[in-house]
Amino acid sequence: MIEDDGMLLNFSTDTTEDNNDSKFNSGKVTGGRWKERRKLKMMMEGREPVKRKTFEELENSDMDTNKKPKSDSSGRKSYNQQSNNESVKDVVRPVVSKVNPSQVNTQIVSSLFTAARQVETSVNINEHDDKEEINPSNAPLAADNFDSLKIEQQLVNHLNEKMRIQKPTSIQKLVLPQLLSSKNNDLFIHAQTGSGKTLAFALPILSKILSMKTRVDRKSGCFAIFITPTRELATQIYHVLSELTNCCHYLVPCLLIGGESKKSEKARLRKGCNFIIGTPGRILDHFQNTQSVKEQLAVSLRYVVLDEADKLMELGFEETLTDILKLIHDISLNTSVYPQLPSRIMHILCSATSKGSVTKLGNVALQNYKMISNSHVTNELENATVPDQLLQKIAIVPPKLRLVTLAATLDSIHRKHIEQKKKKLDYVSRTVVFLSCSDSVNFHFEAFSSSDANHRNLVGESARLLTKGNDILPSFDPENDPDFICYKLHGSLSQQIRSSTLQHFSKTNENVKGKHLVLFCTDVASRGLDLPEIGTVIELDPPFAVEDHLHRIGRTARAGKHGESLLFLLPGEEEGYMEYIKPYHTKGWKLVNYTNDLLKPSFQNVNVKRSDKETSKNVEEWDTNATTWHLNVERRVLEDSSFKDIAMKGYASHIRAYATHISKEKKFFNVKCLHLGHLAKSFALRERPKTMGLQNTKNGGEAKKNSKESAKNKMFRLARMAVKQSSGEFNY
């Protein structure tokens, strides 16, 4: 009995201990999240959770790896030391090799001045001679006047007194007698940019109408149609004709362009007009749908002018132009009403360049035409040249430095503006920056116009005046207004914004007096626009064809005035582009060193402040200031998600646009030769292009799938597309 009691006592004690152990060391903990279960199990086992160290802590711990670890009295390492050593091993492998790069912040701030591709060009193959005496090639002729060209005296007086034009240019002297003669030949006018082609064909047409003894008014019919490739150029010709017809108010021009109200245009056409100016799509639309237009053309139409003919063909208007010409030629012409006018419809083509596409259009539109050119090259009109008084500069800039070098260039121009303003308080200078695509225009406009809160919108979101305290350029005085206005212009803007922006940039009034105006734009502003007082043209992105290069730089050095142009090229293959454009620059160019000629003068001996913290130390080293300026833009990309989206769109669109160069220039502009990481740096992006793609894919993948489109929604969508297509032609 005693043994049994002892056995029961021993058994009872063992059972209690086993039960306690089983409660403490039960096999599985259930319920809750796995992290909580893991923590609970480790606590039950008397262990602490392993804390993963950051990279900084790991680097600090590496400093003590050679030190002998402390041991306890038994000579063994403590448990905490063992767990810490094990944690180091556990941390290193997963972070480096197994973590998805889109899930961690792996940004690396690369230096602006390292790992740049070596510039291969050491000698300027087409040096500009500063000592050579230059006579402007597109200037008005000093020895001639409009009286000798048999223009109506009423028009000559208006030119001299109201428009302040006394002397004709060389192309005007050649064209006016041809259009005023009785031979009635079609003409192909080929002349340099800025040489006055608009007046060359507008003056004789207007003079011919004024010479008629018959009284005319807006009900007399349409005498001439002017077709242009862009809305901006059509608007400019409309303003020129409006100014010319101020001497004969009974003659009325009419503008027909996409983006405007067709109802208002129809009303103007029904009232009557003497000149129609517009883009191909809208003109064809009215010819097909507005009956009053056809009725006016039968009696009066005598002239059809195709301005910038090469661009009309390049933009795919060949079929539209063919339809317009067919409709015009199908109209039976009645010459008895105005016998003093030509007995047939005269066709006039105008272009600063002559290519195969223009010749093709000439064969369709012209009959027995005569070529008129003021070019020195008579047998090879392909080799159009830039104005002699234009100073061309070329800078070979690594892709990482494109943005900061552009800032240095604008700063240098602004310093000159400040010096000129000391002599003349209301001095206005204008600079045009050409870029390859609209998204790139948006990025550079935002980067330079809204770096902080010190700015004010002037024309919607497309024109901004920088105000006191703005420090986007090193030359800005924080105590004074910078007198700096940024504009943007591209085909994706609405027609109203495009028109108002261009008008604000072009007009010299109290709002812009004494200010430096900078326009960021695509090639929409490269054709035919006579923008006043353009001092410098900057081609940050090379043109898609050499003809576009000639038209871009043709915005400056117009009508005999001096001007400058700066072309940015990347090191490597793009350097061969200089040899390609050499025949067009007969007076040579200056090869600019981006370090000594641009960055150092702008960033030396100035204090560029950091945007993230205030520092009392003044830094005068140019490279440090340039780096600080660029990092300020990068920090803004990190902090402002909307600006980051603009930067990423600009970067992606720039690469897509880069791949669209014409085939014969692909050897200079090969997208496979671009360093995409360095190019991303020029858009203030720190992420690698691959990481950006992963993030975009992930974001797109997480978006919910769109349900199948209903028949009703599809009908409305197609209707909206039809309305949009009919409201305007190619949105250039």
Swiss-Prot record:
Keyword Nucleus attributed: yes
Function text: ATP-binding RNA helicase involved in the biogenesis of 60S ribosomal subunits and is required for the normal formation of 25S and 5.8S rRNAs.
Annotated segments matching region Disordered: 1-91, 692-711
Q: What class of enzyme is it?
A: hydrolase
Localization, UniProt: Nucleus, Nucleolus
Name of protein: ATP-dependent RNA helicase DBP7
Domains: entry comment: The Q motif is unique to and characteristic of the DEAD box family of RNA helicases and controls ATP binding and hydrolysis.
